[in-house]
Amino acid sequence: MDLLNSDIILINILKYYNLKKIIINRDNVININILKKLVNLEELHIIYYDNNILNNIPENIKSLYISNLNIINLNFITKLKNITYLDISYNKNSNISNIILPHSIEFLNCESCNINDYNFINNLVNLKKLIISKNKFGNFNNVFPISIVELNMESIQIKDYKFIEKLINLKKLDISFNVKKNNIHLIKFPKSITHLCDYQSYKENYNYLKNLSNIIEYEFDDTIDVKLSDIDISKYYNLQYLDIQNCEINTDILLCHTKLKKIKINFNNSKKNIIIDLPISLECLKISNNFNINNYYFLTQLIRLKKIKIVNSYINILNACKSIEIIKFISCKSTYNFNFNCLEKYKKLDTLSLGFNNIYNLNECILPISIRQIIINNVEIIKKSNFLNNLYNLEYFEINSIICNDIITINLSKIKIKHFKIIYCNDTLFNIMLPDTIEIIEYIHDKNINLDWKKYKNLKKIKTLNNMKDILYKIYKNTNVEIEII
């Protein structure tokens, strides 16, 4: 039976009729006569540019993704009266500033669209989230509807922040990488703001933080020198994440009354005794450059602590709550010898990073059998790794940032790991033996190591650098091993 073209179109319409989402690319181009009749279609991603497709988008569409297509004429959007989500980012030559967008839009992404006139936004009375980052500086007075809850203005080089004071419903604000001199320190930000990112933006001081009593997350960057005593961080009761790594710790850290869950502290090689009072809600803690072994006493009070990371610091013993799951020591030292026996009590420990200048009693202690992941960045620990023998649940083994002139032998053939990773060990030579259980090898290393790639029967994936590409493609040409070049 011969079918007419109209019959074929009808069959295809019935085939696609109930689809809610379609992605159009070079390999999946839909007939425009079918597309415009898909009345149930809600979400459309167009990755392949075709003007006929744009002019036949169903008017009932709710979400449209047309990023980086070099579209010039966006007039077709005005017909989409039900659209709530619109992504037109990276269309640098479009006429977006000259059209009236549908009032229904709640999410608009026009990042990197070469915009300098933003008045078209004022019409969007239902707008909740707006991304206009990486565009040109313009006049923002009376541009943004007060409905906006999230606003991303990264890298626009804002000079006058006065417009933000009117956004009374604003909760999340990203003004990072605005390096031009501006008046932010004179602005009274809306109290509604809970998340503020001003990373690497120009600021004369932090006076603008005073009004942000509801802030939940904040990170101090290194654009200006600031002392902790200059900022009363204790008044931010709703804080959940705080990064003060770029603050000079010249006063006590008193935050026990907050809702803090994560904090990063840099002691800047100080040997001062600091009173640290953190809430029991804390789950993640990072301490850097602490040269005073007495500044860890507060850890025992943190009964919900799950993760601790200690970097370039002095520590002799770790006394924390027994429920801790992740412990990472990176480039750490001790005034005498770190007592590894203190790790035996952490029966829920999942991940352990061992970066110490000595191994003292590591091979004599009995590490928790709960450990599934080990990360090592000390050559002496690699050479004497008997402590691994009792880790029956170990699945992941990583060698990180080891530099040595000798050839290092690593025998893991009897340790039933599934994932092995070596990274940042430039100019170091290894002789590595892995078990048959190995499934993933990450070889982010610029030297060819002595490793028998062929014998691992369970191997599924290798991630490596370009220098190993030809060798591995040849070895695994007719196998199911996936090779990813990074």
From Swiss-Prot:
UniProt keyword annotations, A-Z: Leucine-rich repeat, Repeat
InterPro entries referenced in this protein's UniProt entry, alphabetically: LRR_dom_sf
LRR repeats, residue ranges: 18-39, 43-59, 60-81, 82-103, 104-125, 126-147, 148-168, 169-190, 198-219
Membrane-spanning intervals of the chain: none
Keyword Repeat tagged: yes
Record has Repeat as a keyword: yes
Protein name as it appears in the record: Uncharacterized leucine-rich repeat-containing protein AMV014/Q3
Species per Swiss-Prot/TrEMBL record: Amsacta moorei entomopoxvirus
Source organism phylogeny: Viruses, Varidnaviria, Bamfordvirae, Nucleocytoviricota, Pokkesviricetes
